[in-house]
Amino acid sequence: MNQLAASVSVDVQTAYIETQSSPDEDKYLFSYTITISNLSNEAITLKSRHWCITDADGRKSEVHGTGVVGETPTIKPNSSYEYTSGTVLETPLGVMEGSYTMVDSDGNEFEAPISAFRLSIPGLLH
């Protein structure tokens, strides 16, 4: 792992959006709020994202895109960037994981991993 990648912390909070979900139609909407912390001594810029989303039936989808929520933020040393986005699953349980392609101040790209996190309706799991 790139030394800078080890200096990027990714924290995730998830929520089930019941008011915009339709379980009878196999539509479960989840939001996720991500905080990306730059623990290094140099600025880094988030260029793109890659997600692998798996529902409870094993269906996988991949998402590749520039930036996050329409931005390619530069995160200063010892600072954080937070955003909220969402995804729709066909099951009440799923998992997301992936990575961010980041660029350091010298223009070198590196991958910052996003550990797997669970999307679940309340009360489904103990």
From Swiss-Prot:
Superkingdom per UniProt: Bacteria
SUPFAM superfamilies in alphabetical order: ApaG-like (SSF110069)
Domain (ApaG): residue spans on this chain: 2-126
Regions that span the bilayer: none
Database matches in InterPro entries: ApaG-like, ApaG_domain, ApaG_sf, Uncharacterised_ApaG
HAMAP family per UniProt: ApaG
Name used for this protein in its record: Protein ApaG
Species assigned in the record: Shewanella pealeana (strain ATCC 700345 / ANG-SQ1)
